[in-house]
Amino acid sequence: MIKSAMAEKLWSKLEKTLVNNGKAFISVTGGGGKTTFLVSFSSYLKSLGYSVLITTSTKLASPFSFDYKVDGIFLSPSIINYWPGKGESVFYGSYNEALGKTTAPPSSMVSLLYDRYDVVIVEADGSRMLPLKIHTQRDPVIWKTTTAIVAVSGLWAYGKPIKQSVFGPEEKSGLVDKSYYEYLIGEPEGMAKGMSPHTDNVFLFNGGDVVEERVRKEMKTLSLPYSSFGFIVSMNKDEIYETL
């Protein structure tokens, strides 16, 4: 049984970890909860009075078909005429009618907008709703303005077939276990891709509330690169179960 009353609050911890002097430009990669991260973390930051810009360097579901819980939506360069207030969130992208999705706006425009928003959160990767991701040469798309990278993965893949759990060019077979997560962390096209010693790096293993305690304890012993943080969490419950 999970003693959630004892668990540390996730969004509070991430605000302290990722936001420095009131500013952060966060790129989110991987699978298993990126969109939940966008919505939940931006909502938490709003509650603290931060102005937040949500965007993508790849593709995102249209804000007209998915509720990002924002106060404003801009799908054109007219956003340059808008100045956000404190505690306000705005969605920005370019709409692709053929795809029915929001695609990446010019990175130069987003860099300019960073001057007027406290926090920018960028969905920098796609995983087609699968919990794990192997990248290609094309992704993730990390813009130069990035100050922090959050690599998300879903723990509900544990014990499931690799072929059914991973989006991307994966040739391995078998079941997902701790050694496979270790492989994903160390693989050049894996979880750590895009991270550097110059960014604040966080690994979020989401779904800590849906796996057994023995799995959480086993995953807690994973080794992470750089001076990064790692947390076994439940985004839906705003809880941290283990710190790596």
Where in this protein do the model-derived segments appear?
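Charged, amphipathic alpha-helical linker segments immediately N-terminal to NTP-binding catalytic cores
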Residues: 1-5
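Short, basic, glycine/proline-bearing loop/turn elements
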Residues: 24-28, 87-100, 124, 176
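N-terminal phosphate/diphosphate-binding loop that engages ATP/GTP or pyrophosphate donors
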Residues: 42-97
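Conserved catalytic-core segment of NTP-binding enzymes
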Residues: 100-104, 125-225, 234, 243-244
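General beta-strand structural signal in soluble alpha/beta enzymes
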Residues: 28, 53-56, 91-94, 120-126, ...
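Loop/turn-to-beta-strand initiation segments
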Residues: 86-90, 116-120, 148
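Solvent-exposed alpha-helices and their adjacent loops that cap or buttress functional pockets
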Residues: 17-21, 81-85, 112-114, 140-144, ...
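Walker A (P-loop) phosphate-binding motif
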Residues: 7-48
